[in-house]
A protein has these predicted regions:
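Glycine-rich loop-to-alpha-helix module at the N-terminal edge of alpha/beta enzyme cores
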Residues: 34, 57-63, 75-78
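Short beta-strand to alpha-helix junction loop
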Residues: 67-68
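PLP-dependent class I/II
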Residues: 1-30, 36-54, 81, 86-421
Length: 421
């Protein structure tokens, strides 16, 4: 093969994907899919109705403003001004993107240079590392560590950063830190005190913060989501990322947004105008109208920002009980719609799994899909090479699923438990 057909160096070693691999394995209709994080519950009726109405309007089927449909950026500005306690310029401080992925890509390409160091908290959403390496940056990893409290169920809040270890990762080469709260896959919701430690270090070392907050509405009782961009000295150095897919359970719409100061957002705009240019007009208009419906009733229990976490809290508690009933010790998430559990306690014989070089959780999930018809995601996929051992006994289950899907998963898990008893 011609050397000219060889891949560009910037994507060297980035060709494997946990999502492609395990989505393919779970494609069999007989497999109960608690793997990839997409809802199989119905989105709100009014969201679908808005899209249906808008699709019939001719001019809304054409290109729109490249940095965000005017009605959408206005709605986003109105929504988030309530939390930032200051005006957000819809045209200069908000950028609508092709999903949160697009926001991450624009931020990294627009702000991170070759040779820059970027701090990544482990576990992390897998594309963080890939996007940073494509930009020529050096990811610097720091792990969350579990410090369980005796006599208490292990929760995502038990996973914390060591402040001294975190501080040791900052230096003159540090360009940014990647923050994810509520966290995927742990479900950790960073406290105000934890975020203040990060903010203080960002200010001390003049470091940017790329804050992935796509699960911002999915926070369970006893916890509160804080935006690090609202901390003193942080607005001017923070890009905050949101997602329509996570907000309204419409992951297929692939709409996201970045919010930040004009002097940062303009660089993300440059990337967008020279790559995807714009996002789908009808989807943006439908999202805008859906947002206005809920903006006007944010204190109402029927507001989707309030009703979805209540619905998911029930599903979360059901999954916790189910996993505990078969002897597992799940990490109870404080936010998001994933739950992880240590599956090594099941003592499954994985001798017949071919690739002995794969981490334990990869082999376990492949075995579970094949033999139990139940899909999950290995948590070591969210780790760098050096920390995979720390997390390879955990798998991630998604619980934003219909009751019938969770019923099927429960049947599989309980039958499995009976076989082992």
């Amino acid at each position: 093969m011609s050397l000219k057909f060889k891949n560009a160096k910037r994507i060297e070693g980035l060709d494997s994907s946990v999502w492609i691999e395990f989505t393919k394995l779970a494609a069999d209709p007989s497999v109960v899919n608690l793997g990839q994080g997409f809802p199989d519950i119905s989105p709100p009726i009014y969201v679908k109705e808005e899209l249906s109405k808008i699709a019939a309007i001719d001019n809304l089927n054409q290109y729109t403003r490249g940095f965000g449909h005017p009605s959408l950026v206005k709605a986003l500005s109105c929504l988030y001004e309530k939390f930032y306690q200051n005006q957000i310029n819809p045209n200069e401080e908000i950028l609508v993107t092709v999903g949160a992925y697009g926001s991450l890509f624009n931020a990294i390409q627009g702000l991170i240079d070759e040779g820059d160091e970027v701090i990544v908290i482990v576990p992390f959403y897998d594309c963080y590392e890939s996007m940073l390496r494509m930009a020529g940056a050096t990811p610097v990893f720091v792990p969350l560590r579990c410090k369980p409290v005796d006599g208490k169920k292990c929760s995502s809040s038990d996973w914390t950063l060591d402040p001294q270890e975190l501080a040791s990762k900052f230096n003159s080469k540090t360009k940014a830190i990647m923050l994810n709260t509520p966290h995927n896959p742990l479900g950790k919701v960073y406290t105000k005190e934890e975020l203040q430690v990060i903010a203080d270090l960002c200010i001390k070392y003049d470091t940017l913060c790329i804050s992935d907050e796509v699960y911002e509405w999915l926070v369970y009782p006893g916890n509160k989501h804080f935006k690090i961009a609202t901390f003193p000295g942080m607005w001017e150095r923070t890009i905050t990322i949101g997602s329509a897919g996570k907000t309204f359970s419409v992951t297929g719409w692939k709409l996201g947004w970045s919010i930040g100061p004009k002097h940062l957002i303009k660089h993300l705009q440059t990337v967008q105008q020279n790559t995807v240019y714009t996002c789908a007009t009808p989807l943006q208009e439908a999202l805008a109208q859906a947002l206005w419906i809920d903006i006007k009733r944010m204190d109402d229990p029927e507001c989707y920002f309030n009703s979805l976490p209540k619905e998911l809290e029930v599903k979360r508690d059901r999954m916790v009980h189910l996993l505990e009933s078969v002897g597992l010790k799940p990490i109870v998430p404080d936010g998001g719609y994933f739950i992880i559990a240590d599956v090594s306690l099941l003592d499954v014989d994985l001798f017949d799994m071919k690739d002995s070089n794969e981490p334990y959780d990869y082999k376990f999930v492949k075995w579970m899909i094949k033999n139990k018809k139940l899909s999950a995601i290995p948590v070591s996929a969210f780790c760098n090479a050096e920390t995979k051992l720390q997390f390879e006994k955990f798998v991630r289950f998604c619980f934003i699923k219909k009751d019938s899907t969770l019923d099927a998963a429960e049947e599989i898990i309980k039958a499995w438990s009976r076989q082992n008893s």
